Amino acid sequence: MAKQAIKRAKILAVKNNNKIGVLLINLGTPDEPSVPAVRRYLRQFLSDPKVIDVPSLMRWIIVHLCILPFRPKRSAKLYQKIWMPEGSPLLVYSEMLRERVGETLGDDFCVALGMRYGKPSIETALKKLQEAQCRQLIVLPLFPQYSTSTTASALEEVRAKNSFKEMTVIDRFFEEPHYIDSMTTLIHENLNEFQPDYFLFSYHGLPERHLVKSGCQLAICNRKNNCSPISSSNENCYRAQCFETSRLIAKKLNLTDQQYGVAFQSRLGRAKWIEPYTDKYLIELSKKGIKKLMVVCPSFPVDCLETLEEIGIRAQSQWQRLGGETLKLIPSLNAHPQWVNAIAKMAKKSLQLF
């Protein structure tokens, strides 16, 4: 009862000219699918010490001498395959999400979108919220599973540009019931037209050293199999969070352990990344005789290059070459009505933290 009274008081304060600002953060996207635009984006993205976490001189050499002379041309061609008439899918769907969350929350809230890299920047989004005379700030990075290279980097940028005295952060929601329910509903909607032999949950990968820096004890972690359920010993482990999300969704779908698996995509460079790798997992599934595969990407709430091209085109092509019949990619949550409501509920719940 005390918590509910506090919440009512908070909402009453909002109505008395204390508007709440909500900052949704996504990773970012090039302005256009051209080589110069992709080069600008990659330069900013890969120069982040939380992304390529090596000494600054070594990072400069890697980015400017090993990546930027070659990768922008290849990446631009990939972006061209998924670019929408309205622009980048990541930006189009993120803006749609921002707009609908704002409509759902109502006039007492102001919702802005900021990208960690590219436009609109986090700084620009914060200025919009300040101009709207918001008094308090709720920050929600759209990364369900916490990692230093996404969530921590975004929050570091917020703190560097922020002038709000009252701020609360939703830094992860990998096991948030509203998020899990939204994912489950989305999958159920697609099961009406496609019945798979197997479900694959594919997450963005990370270098293993990032897990070590987050406190994950790899020496006692059975990395080849499912991570242990979340506890105080692995609560900051990105890989463990991914497995926990998968377990929760699978439970809602009444899947057995033999009906689904977890893998990690988008690896870059020669360093050891967390396993199993999605492309290699597809090979193993084909050897087991799986023909109809449904792929879900829970770490990407908004469709982007990694979902639409890497899975929707490249993995689809690989699956057919391996003899598979169908690879069905479940679209990201994007601006799904249940997901919009889920974000609104998480934002209102976070008011108790002020």
From Swiss-Prot:
Organism the protein comes from: Coxiella burnetii (strain Dugway 5J108-111)
Catalytic activity from the UniProt record: heme b + 2 H(+) = protoporphyrin IX + Fe(2+)
Localisation per UniProt entry: Cytoplasm
One cellular component (GO) term of this entry: cytoplasm
Single GO BP term: heme biosynthetic process
Name by which UniProt lists this protein: Ferrochelatase
Coiled coil (UniProt feature): none
TM regions (residue ranges): none
Pathway where it operates: Porphyrin-containing compound metabolism; protoheme biosynthesis; protoheme from protoporphyrin-IX: step 1/1
Keywords (A to Z) from UniProt: Cytoplasm, Heme biosynthesis, Iron, Lyase, Metal-binding, Porphyrin biosynthesis
Gene Ontology MF terms in the entry: ferrochelatase activity; metal ion binding
Function: Catalyzes the ferrous insertion into protoporphyrin IX.
EC number(s) reported in the record: 4.98.1.1
Family recorded in the similarity comment: Belongs to the ferrochelatase family.
Enzyme class (EC, first level): lyase
Gene: hemH
Predominant subcellular localization, coarse grouping: cytoplasm
Keyword Cytoplasm: yes
Residue numbers binding Fe cation: 204, 306
The organism's taxonomic lineage, starting at the top: Bacteria, Pseudomonadati, Pseudomonadota, Gammaproteobacteria, Legionellales
InterPro entries attached to this UniProt entry: Ferrochelatase, Ferrochelatase_AS, Ferrochelatase_C, Ferrochelatase_N
